[in-house]
Amino acid sequence: MESITVFSAGSFCYALQELSDIFRQIHHIEIKAFCGPAGILRQQIEQGNRGDIFISANPGNVLQLADSKKIYQKLTIAFNQLALTTLNLEHFRHKSIFELLFDRSFLGVKNVSKY
């Protein structure tokens, strides 16, 4: 079976797995995915590791590869957005979300479950 090698930022790993399964069923081509920090994957490509596709949420990584002539072409296919919210509780209503972000007393997790 033919294969495509993909270096992907860890944040895209779960979506890549789902897309890989569908792609394999339709095209009968295996996706070999290597997921991790995009900066480290970029360094591996710069050092000679070969892949067919590189996925990074940080356009700087892609630009570095383009500048060093390590990639043939680049394409932005999506943009991230960050949404911030708070619970509808009285003690959150007296500060803006940005104030809460920098107030360490509000940034804590009391109950963390094991995976």
Curated annotation (Swiss-Prot):
Gene3D superfamilies: Periplasmic binding protein-like II
GO BP annotations listed: molybdate ion transport
GO molecular function, one term: molybdate ion binding
GO annotation, cellular component aspect: outer membrane-bounded periplasmic space
Pfam families (alphabetical): SBP_bac_11
Superkingdom of the organism of origin: Bacteria
Protein name: Uncharacterized protein HI_1469
